[in-house]
Amino acid sequence: MRALPAEVATAIGQKTKVGVVARPVINMSQNDAKAYTEWLSAKTGNVYRLPSEAEWEYAARAGTVTPFSSGKTINSSWSNYGNKKGKTDWVGHYSPNGFGLHDVHGNVWEWVEDCWNNGYAGAPSDTNVWQASDCRLRVLRGGSWVNDLQSVRSAYRQAFEPGNRNFNVGFRIARTLP
């Protein structure tokens, strides 16, 4: 089994302790996130990965067509955004969306697998990863605790270099079912 890279293990170890509510893991590049999913897949025998952009948005919307899974707007009692707290909040602190997912709006940006594309023209019509266009940039979704309301909408997306780390960037994993 491939070892988890030391910098990824250190970052995750600092944020997760058994029986302790944790803050999201931050300062993670897409490369770090993918290394973690490869390690977890090898360790468990299940297939873990970053979600595609389409999967992420579908999960964030939770069956809605509104800007937020909770409706047309959101406030700080439902999400950590707008630098109101000055830091990340505990994982699961806010109410889940209709699919049971917590913290999809704000708290930390989340990596997805897709390459950056300026728009949706030519996007896959299913949930497949979009590998066309500019793969020197990848996609972040969800916004973070420092972003404004516009940037934490379900549809908002941001380009970022896959090797870069930032204080407000983390990841959420998906599991491929057998």
Give the predicted meaning of each segment.
Residues 167-178:
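Short, structured beta-strand segments at or near domain termini in extracellular proteins/domains
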